[in-house]
């Protein structure tokens, strides 16, 4: 069962279950900033806000670059829906139309407990990506648009996992969490995309990934953040 496989992956990531924000509930993870410097909307004074295509493309470029650099190609997709807001059949219709996905391999009703201790009906849809044609950039773009003119059902509800294991969670246009079963698994991502790590969490993430390594020296050029090993 894909649901059982997903649960096993969470345990291997050191998590008892899915609890948001995911980054703060996993021993090893990286939180990336996805939204760039471009304004989100073209004209905030307009009666109807219009999303800035340059902002969307910049966020998509970052999310897709990190996706392509994952330790392996994701082979399991989970999307959560909330039938209190829309019937499960309607949710699935919207998901399939927007993502170009087939009927899910598994569909599981569940109960979600939120941060306030309240319960909500949930339905979990699972796809085995190894057996279907999958367009990851279409998925990523729909998530990015979720809070800024798209369908909000994709916000904080889409999870991709793969061998390692790892979990890739683009939660909205602002950020992305990648969790791993070990520091070594995510070390290439840490080095390659260090300049995109969310500054608020940078010190914490640096401590995890440089625990047994020479101290990194941080510097800024033209507003962009860089780092190098001390002594070089």
Residue locations for each model-derived region?
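Alpha-helical oligomerization segments
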Residues: 158-232
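Extended, low-hydrophobicity segments enriched in charged/polar residues
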Residues: 1-150
């Amino acid at each position: 069962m894909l649901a059982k496989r997903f649960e096993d992956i969470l345990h291997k990531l050191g998590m008892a279950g899915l609890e948001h924000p995911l980054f703060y509930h996993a021993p090893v993870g990286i939180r990336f900033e996805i939204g760039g410097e471009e304004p989100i909307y073209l004209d905030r004074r307009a009666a109807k806000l219009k999303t800035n295509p340059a902002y969307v493309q910049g966020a998509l470029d970052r999310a897709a670059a990190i996706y392509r650099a994952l330790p392996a190609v994701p082979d399991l997709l989970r999307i959560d829906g909330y039938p209190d807001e829309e019937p499960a059949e309607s949710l699935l219709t919207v998901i399939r139309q927007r993502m170009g996905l087939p009927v899910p391999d598994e569909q599981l009703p569940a109960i979600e407990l939120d941060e306030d201790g309240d319960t909500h009906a949930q339905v979990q849809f699972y796809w085995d990506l190894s057996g279907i044609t999958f367009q990851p950039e279409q998925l990523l773009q729909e998530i990015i648009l979720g809070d800024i003119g798209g369908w909000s059902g994709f916000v904080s509800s889409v999870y991709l996992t793969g061998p390692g294991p790892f979990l890739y969670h683009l939660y909205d246009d602002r950020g992305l969490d990648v969790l791993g079963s070990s520091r070594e698994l995510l070390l290439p991502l840490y080095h390659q995309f260090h300049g995109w790590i969310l500054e608020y969490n940078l010190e914490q993430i640096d401590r995890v990934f440089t625990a047994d390594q020479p101290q990194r020296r941080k510097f800024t050029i033209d507003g962009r953040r860089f780092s190098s090993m001390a002594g070089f």
